[in-house]
């Protein structure tokens, strides 16, 4: 019998609103909304805004794993990782962040982590 401990969602967002990609507060709110929609428990968060025309890097540490974001406003691009354990609603991360970042195109990949584990 096999068991998958978690699913890792990789979300590349293209054509995002440049102003949103620079707005740490708005990005934090969007990630928190995504985490809450998956029914995850937020343990802590840390966000950093880079100077000049730089973007934002942020992470939510969850009891069920993490959600992180890295933005490049100059390219209108954001990269998001969402690793969620258990039966959490991973698709909600994609749904909410695509809406909140006003994207033109999204590429979503889900990787089953630990799929070779065998339970006896």
Feature annotation, model-predicted:
Residues 1-120:
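Polybasic/polar functional segments that serve as interface/processing modules
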